[in-house]
Amino acid sequence: FPLHKVKDKFEEVPTFEQFDKLVGDAMKAAGGSVVLLTSTIVSPSTKEIIAKFPNLKHVQYDAVSYSGMILANEASGFGKRIPSYNFSAAKVIVSLGADFLGTWLSPVEFAKGYSKGRKIDEKNPSMSKHYHFEGHLSMTGSNADERFTHRPSETGAIAVALLAELGGAVAPSIADAKLAAGIKKVAADLKANNGAAMVVSGSNDKNVQI
């Protein structure tokens, strides 16, 4: 339970309803600007709640920086923001080092969507395909259908090589034959599932994100 300071000691607040009231009352009593410090928030519902407090200054700070993604989205015309991803709608998922089931952005939300695409039933007769490229073992990589390993320094080259296979760049040289073959296979699957495929990158390099 949350703790509430009463005089010189801390006491438990037994319900979150009471805690919400304590926070709301404290914000009203503060009068002026109140600072809310959080990690990056991508949830629309959470943003909606925060927007209800006009005197609230929302500061977002991440122990792990996502500035590369933010700047890439801004440069691409999508605004200086972090998007949300609907993994349940993707038939093909390609991750370039994004541990979306473990530590990347909103893993609880992503795991829920990801699991929907991995279950076969009458409404969903085929399971989504998950390819993963990474420089070290991760929770997400261990769940992939096909996992390709590489040196961390090769992340950018792999992103460019994949883009080249899709017709958008000059292909760099990939020495590892298995890795090069994997890139070609992934690109072919992305093309075959155009409109129902997703590529995410865990890199904090703006150019890789673009």
Stretches with model-predicted labels:
Residues 92, 146-210:
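Active-site phosphate/pyrophosphate-binding segments
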Residues 1-172:
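N-terminal export/assembly segments and adjacent metallocofactor-ligating motifs
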